[in-house]
C-alpha cells in the first residue's frame, strides 16, 4: 500500500496470525492444524502457533488464505466454512486495508468437545 508519504508493507505472518485468531473465534472451529506431509499426521496447534495452520499469499495488494482447520464433531461443515469465510474476509480486510481474493478451507480433522 502506498500514499504520498510512503509505503506500508504487511508481512504474510502478520496476516496469518491475525486470521488465525479470528478463525478460532468462529463457531465450530476447534483450532488450526499442522499437517506433517511426510507422515500424513495432523496435530492441533496451540494458540501461539495458529499461523502455522494458515498459508498467506499477497499479490498486488490482494490476499489469498489457505486454512487447515480442525472442526467440532457434529457441526455442519458447510455452515462452519461459510461463517469462517465471511468473518475472516470482513475482519482481515478491515485490519489490512487489502482485498481478500480467495479463501480456501481444508478440514484436516474432527474433535469431540466435552
Question: What is the role of each PLM region?
Answer:
Residues 1-73, 82, 94, 99-114:
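Contiguous, often N-terminal, cationic amphipathic patches that form binding interfaces
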Residues 77-79:
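Solvent-exposed, non-transmembrane alpha-helical starts
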